[in-house]
Design a protein with these regions (language model features):
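A short loop-to-beta-strand scaffold at the N-terminal edge of the catalytic core in hydrolase folds
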Residues: 88-100, 106-107
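Short beta-strand/loop motif that positions the catalytic acidic residue
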Residues: 222, 228-230, 234
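Short beta-strand element of the alpha/beta-hydrolase
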Residues: 105-114
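Primarily recognizes the serine-hydrolase "nucleophile elbow" in alpha/beta-hydrolase
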Residues: 151, 155-223
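C-terminal catalytic histidine-bearing segment of alpha/beta-hydrolase fold enzymes
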Residues: 1-16, 20-27, 229, 252-293
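Short amphipathic alpha-helix adjacent to the substrate-entry channel of hydrolases
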Residues: 121-140
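Conserved alpha/beta-hydrolase "acid-adjacent" motif
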Residues: 235-244
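N-terminal targeting or regulatory segments adjacent to alpha/beta-hydrolase or S9 domains
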Residues: 1-93
Length: 293
């Protein structure tokens, strides 16, 4: 079976290859109707606050996951153990979707936005993760609880560092990525002090952070090098606030790079078929620059 634009959400969620986690492919908090199709839900009425949603992009992601799962590759990893999930059943609503790159290569952890109301992974983290894996990097897209987002991101980092050998990933010089609310998560956990406060193990700070369309403005000497982008027509995140933040990072001696795209609105994701298309290659180059320092 190959998923198409006419495949129903129910068919994807209940697919045997996605048993136990298929429901996490779509936003739990928005409760899409199971009889709607992939094409039906790929719009801003379903993924609220987002723009530039592409059915083709969603299908590329879903079919990649399906193909790998059918080859008996583990594509989903819970971040909490069974005892923790029994004590707090909401922790079952979390986990990492794995987009595999080269063995023993560095990893990226990507957080979709959704206003801390839902997790827009299918548009705002899965496509970026797939693109990173195609470049050879191991990429993990986090499904988190919107009201406990920072706790879940910290737990995800703990999990990846604790299981790096089994996952065949290199934990050093990892990167944190995020869009909108997910960008706030990446920025905060990319900060050395916040990382030490929130994680339970000794974890090195991220080598860099990717921050898409967020008006987060605070800076600290503990912040990570940052690549950021936004559109001029973003009515949620002001691009000038973002630009000023990165200028302030530079004043602190922290490497940063900012890109603004004329006419783009909030939540353009990977930017397919827009003036932002290809931004992810620039972000990867920025990451590689930090790695090679």
């Amino acid at each position: 079976m190959v998923f198409t634009k006419d495949t129903k959400i129910r068919e994807i969620i209940q697919h045997p290859s996605f048993r136990g986690f298929g429901h996490l492919l779509f936003p739990l908090q928005l409760a899409f109707h199971p009889e709607e199709t992939v094409q039906d839900v790929t719009d801003s009425n379903h993924f609220i606050w987002y723009s530039n949603l592409k059915t083709k992009t969603s299908l590329e992601v879903l079919n990649n996951l399906l193909e790998r799962a059918q080859k008996n590759e583990q594509i989903f990893f819970p971040i909490y153990d069974e005892d923790e999930m029994v004590k707090d059943p909401s922790k079952r609503e979390t986990g990492l979707f794995y987009f595999k790159g080269k063995e023993y290569e560095k990893f990226a952890l990507i957080n979709a936005g959704g206003g801390f109301h839902y997790v827009a992974a299918l548009h705002d983290s899965f496509p970026q993760a797939l693109a990173l894996s195609q470049r050879g990097y191991n990429a993990f897209a986090l499904i988190y609880r919107p009201k406990k987002a920072y706790e879940d991101l910290a737990q995800a980092l703990d999990y990846l560092f604790s299981h790096s050998s089994e996952l065949k990933i290199v934990p050093d010089q990892y990167s944190l990525w995020g869009g909108s609310a997910g960008a706030r998560m990446a920025i905060r956990l990319g900060n050395k002090s916040e990382l030490q406060r929130l994680t339970r193990t000794s974890i090195e700070p991220a080598s860099m952070v990717v921050s898409q369309y967020t008006s987060y403005s605070s800076v600290s000497r503990d912040d990570a090098p940052t690549y950021a982008n936004c559109g001029t027509n973003d009515w949620i995140a002001n691009w000038q606030v973002m630009e000023n933040r990165l200028k302030n990072l530079k004043k602190l001696g922290i490497d940063s790079q900012f890109h603004v795209y004329k006419g783009l609105g909030h939540g353009f994701g990977i930017g397919k078929d827009t003036v932002a298309e290809g931004w992810i290659d620039n972000a990867i180059s920025f990451w590689e620059k930090q790695i090679n320092k």
